[in-house]
Structures are given as C-alpha cells and as structure tokens.
Amino acid sequence: MRILYCASEANPFCGSGGLADVAGSLPHTLCRKGQDCRIVVPLYGTIPQELRNSLNFITNFTVPVAWRHQYCGLFWARWHDCTYYFIDNEYYFCLLY
C-alpha cells in the first residue's frame, strides 16, 4: 500500500506535542511492516541545522494566492527507512519561536 501522511509537525524534525510524536512514529511502524509510507511536513525555521543539512532539494515553483504568487520549495530526506517531504515557504513557515 502507498500512504502519504501529511502533518503539521513530526518528530524528530519539528514538534511541540502529541501530534508530532504520532506523526513521527506511526509512519515508521508502517514502513517496517512493508508499506510505502511517506511523510509531508512544513519546513519550519525551527528545524535543527544538523537535520536541515540532510535535506535534498527537489524543485521550486510559485503558487497563486489571491492577488500574489508565493514561493514554494520542495525538499526530501530519508529518516529511519521513511521518506520525508518538506514544503518550504518562509512567509508561512519561518517560525523562530
């Protein structure tokens, strides 16, 4: 089965609560059971630099939003046998809290 797991946060890349714990562990369990599970999360500014260094650039494009066009970058990384995709947009995701 092919599964695309989308979440606002996933450990170890970004997380502040229970959702990050589930999104960081459930897909890995599915991968270990032979499923093709991939995870999509925002590329937050709070992701540690050592993890950011493991990201691979795929492409970038613009997305029409009302009267303007917003940049969107797409990156990927492998972590514990799962593929993560990261959506980059500093306007929305550069949260340095």
Tell where the protein language model's regions lie, with residue ranges.
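Conserved small/polar residues in nucleotide/adenosyl-binding loops
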Residues: Y97
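Short loop/turn segments at strand-loop or loop-helix junctions that form parts
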Residues: I87-Y92
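N-terminal subdomain of nucleotide-sugar transferases
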Residues: M1-F75
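Beta-strand-turn-beta hairpins that frame and shape the catalytic cleft
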Residues: W76-Y85
